[in-house]
């Protein structure tokens, strides 16, 4: 009986994924699409866009950073939502 109870507790912990972390895209506009598992506590993804002599640059990653004026920032809170 104790073995069954212990097994149920272990299965419950594994299924609940108590250490859940967010997954976000983390590639720049000119790079192949890649993802990153964010650090614990980072619950959002961002998409940051700006223009320079190379054209429009898009940067993606975990978190929701503070940006300078003239930089477009979008933050979201679901899996790989920052494409």
Swiss-Prot record:
Changing residue 35 to A: 2.7-fold decrease in potency of inhibition of Torpedo marmorata acetylcholine receptor. The keyword Signal applies. Changing residue 32 to N: 2.2-fold decrease in potency of inhibition of Torpedo marmorata acetylcholine receptor. Residues 45-62 are annotated as: Loop II. Keywords: Acetylcholine receptor inhibiting toxin, Disulfide bond, Ion channel impairing toxin, Neurotoxin, Postsynaptic neurotoxin, Secreted, Signal, Toxin. GO terms for molecular function: acetylcholine receptor inhibitor activity; ion channel regulator activity; toxin activity. Changing residue 67 to A: 2-fold decrease in potency of inhibition of Torpedo marmorata acetylcholine receptor. Changing residue 49 to A: 1.35-fold decrease in potency of inhibition of Torpedo marmorata acetylcholine receptor. Disulfide bonds join 24-45, 38-62, 64-75, 76-81. Residues 24-38 are annotated as: Loop I. This is Erabutoxin a.
